[in-house]
Amino acid sequence: MSRIYQKISNAGFNQAFINKLLPEWWDERLAETPSGKQYASLHLARIFSLAPESLKDESGAASFCFNGNHRFKHRINVGEEDLTVATAVAYSAARIAANNFGIDYDPDVNLEWAAVRGRLLKESPYVTLPALVRLCHMSGIPVVYIKNFPAKSCKMAGMALMCSGRPVIVLTQAKKHGFMLFDLAHELGHIARGHLKASDDGVFVDRKIDSDATADLEGEANSYAFGLLSGKEALRIVPETGKYLRADLLARAAKRFGEENAVDPTHVVLNYGFTQNQWPAAMSALKILCSEMPIDQDIVRTMLMEDIDQDCINDDDLELLTALCGA
C-alpha cells in the first residue's frame, strides 16, 4: 500500500489528508493480495479523482482524471496546474452530490437574474444566502461548500461544473458572513449565462472572484451577481455624507439601505468596504449585523446534507462528502 500512497502523495495529497479521507473500514492488508490491491487502487482513485490505471505498480506518476473541459482564470504567474489538486477534491465532492441529490435537475428553469430575484423577493425582503441556496437546490443544482483541502494546496474561490447531467456549484469561502452570498451568485451567473455549455461536462473554475472585473465571462458573471442581489448590474455604495462611517453607523445605514432597496445588508456593507477601501469598518459592521446568525458555511453545509437522498447514498460516499465539507 505504501507505493500507492506515495503516488497519491506525489500528486499533491499529503498523508494526513489521505488518512482523513480513508473510509472507516479501511485495512492496509488489502494490498497483500492482487485482487485486494486492485480494489484499493480503484477506491483510492475514486476518492482523489485519479486515473485507476495510474496507481498500478508498473505505471509512472499518478494522473488526474476529470470529465469535461477546464477553464482556469488565475493571477499572473499562477499556472493552471496550481489548481489541479483542489479541482480534484472539488470533483470528488461534486460527483457525490450530483449522483445522490434528492431533487431532479430542471434544465428549463429560468435562471435570468431578474426572474430569480423576482421569485425570491416574493418570500423575503432581499436575496439572502439561505434563500439563494434553496432556489438552486429546488432547481436541482447542488451547492457544495468544501472546507478541507490538502496542506499547502492552492484552492479556488468557486467552481461551477456539469456533473452527471446537472450543474453543481462548489464554494470554498472561509469568511463567516456575507462573502459567500456574492460568490454563490457569481457562480450561478456562470451557469445562467451558458458558460458551461462549451462541452457536455463543462467546468468553470474561479481562482479568485473579483467583483470589480468587467471583462469577458467574469464580467458577465459579476453583472449577473450584482443584478440578482441588488436589481442593478453595477452597484457602488457610497456614504451620503461624503464621510467614512464608523462600524455601528455603517451597520445601521446598511440595514436601512437594504430594507429600502431590497439588498441584503451584508452585501451593502461589503460593497461599501470594497468601493471605499474601508475594510476594518466593514468587517466590524458585519459582526454587528450577524452577531446572532449562523455562519454561512454551516448554512450551506446543512442545507446540502438535508437535500442529499439518504436512502440512495452509500456509506462510503456519505463519509467522504462529510469529511470534505467538514460536517
Residue ranges of model-derived segments:
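Active-site hotspot residues in diverse enzymes, especially metal/ion-binding acidic/histidine motifs
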Residues: 1-327
